[in-house]
Amino acid sequence: METHQFDVVIIGAGPIGGRASTLLAGEGLQVLMIEEHSEIGRPFQCAGLVTPSAMNAVGVHETVLEEVDGALIHGPSGTLVPVGTEGTLRTYVVCRKRFDQAVVQQGVEAGAHLWVNSVPTEVEVLPSHVQLKVKRNGTHHDIKAKLLIGADGAHSWTRRTFKMGHPKELMIGFQTEVVGYQGRSRWLEMYSGSEIAPGFFAWVIPSGFGTHRIGVWSTA
C-alpha cells in the first residue's frame, strides 16, 4: 500500500474544493483534492447560478451562458412579483461542467494534486496528523495530512464520518433542460405553492442558445 503525505487533503473537487485548493496551494502548501467521480463537473449538481462577486473571485467568465437581471416570482394565487432591475446584473447562469472544471484547474495550476475515481474509506485523527485511507482506481493508498477539509456536498462522507449532525429536513429535486420555452429575456422565473412544489419552489432559468433549465424542489 502506497503512503503519501500532504499538508491539506480536500474531499470533493467541486467549486468549493477547487477554490480552497487554489488559495491553499498558492500559500505554498501541499494540497490533494479527492474526487469520487471520473469527470469533474459531472453529474450536474445544481441550477448553475453564480453571483457576480463569486464570478469575479474566480474569473472564469468564459463559462457564462446567460446574464440575469432578476426573478419573476409567481405566487400560488396568480400574483407576480418582480425582484430585480432591468439592465442591472444580478447573477450569471453558467455551464456547471465548464465552471467546475475551470475552478478546479486553477487549483491544479497553483500546485494542488487531483485524484479522480477516488473515495476515502477510513480516517483516524491523531495528535499530529490525520491518517486517511483512500481507494483510487481500485488501489488502496495511505495518506497523512495536517488538515482535512470536507467539500463533498449534501451527502458528505466527511459529515457522516465525523458525526457532524444530520440535515433537519430532506428535499427532493428534479431539473431538465428544454428548447422552445418563451421566457422574458434576462429574467428567471420562480413558482411557489403547495400544488406545484410543497415546501419550496419551481424555477425556469434561461441557459443560453434558446434553452431553459426547468426544475422543482419540494419536501421529500
Where are these regions (language model features)?
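Beta1/beta-strand and adjacent pyrophosphate-binding region of the FAD-binding site
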Residues: E2-I16
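Glycine-rich FAD pyrophosphate-binding loop
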Residues: V9, T22-F44
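A secondary-structure boundary/capping signal
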Residues: I11-G12, E36, C95, V116
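Predominantly flavin-linked oxidoreductase catalytic cores and closely associated redox partners
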Residues: A13, L23, E27, Q106-A220
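Short alpha-helical segment within the catalytic ATP-binding CA
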Residues: R19
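Short, solvent-exposed loop/turn segments at secondary-structure boundaries
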Residues: P43-C46, F162-K163
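Short, hinge-like loop/turn segments at secondary-structure boundaries
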Residues: L49-P52, P167
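A conserved beta-strand/loop capping segment in the N-terminal third of enzymes
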Residues: T51-V104, N117
